[in-house]
């Protein structure tokens, strides 16, 4: 799921994120098979979120994707068929950021430790963490099995979207008083292309590094409402410390 925002007029405009089943790549394209080998599917009886494999035993995802019983599925392309490259590994630990706020969606980041290490190969591999924070205009790749259109069923095969990082000023203008220093916007102000329902937790990869985590937005692919992503570069110390201690 991707968190969607609904607006209520109370003299001023207040926004409250609510979990809504509305998260798949809109306006993208079918990824070349196994071209995103770090992409994982989080399964709780069915696909609920995406994630990124950052070591052979750790996955990066969104805190709002937490579920008490998760299976991490690697090497997937068509999530409804067994194609031979899959590795299904149960989660041993799920560690949410201690300052995650489900109302503001700040610090929307989670680490998942696999019960056993993944076998790395051409179809299952890790993605590096960023060395620097993303800059406006950088082209990135977003991927996931989220819905292709708000309110519709999810696709069976992995979808991809190429989209630019937007400036902080554009992001704040799109979502007044909602963007924290731990978030950034990516996408197209004209709408039509975006992450959506069930893309949540999935990777935003820029220049070969995982810079973002699909987090929230106002609907999907709406004009003037780009997707909002967790800024991974702000959490490098927490990620390294958490892995070292667990």
Swiss-Prot record:
This is Trypsin V-A. Its main location: secreted. The keyword Secreted applies. Its EC number is 3.4.21.4. Residues 1-15 form the signal peptide. The active site is at residues 64, 108, 200. GO terms for molecular function: metal ion binding; serine-type endopeptidase activity. Belongs to the peptidase S1 family. Its cofactor is Ca(2+). InterPro entries: Peptidase_S1_PA, Peptidase_S1_PA_chymotrypsin, Peptidase_S1A, Serine_Proteases_S1, Trypsin_dom, TRYPSIN_HIS. Ca(2+) binds at residues 76, 78, 86. It catalyses: Preferential cleavage: Arg-|-Xaa, Lys-|-Xaa. Binds 1 Ca(2+) ion per subunit. It is found in: Secreted, Extracellular space.
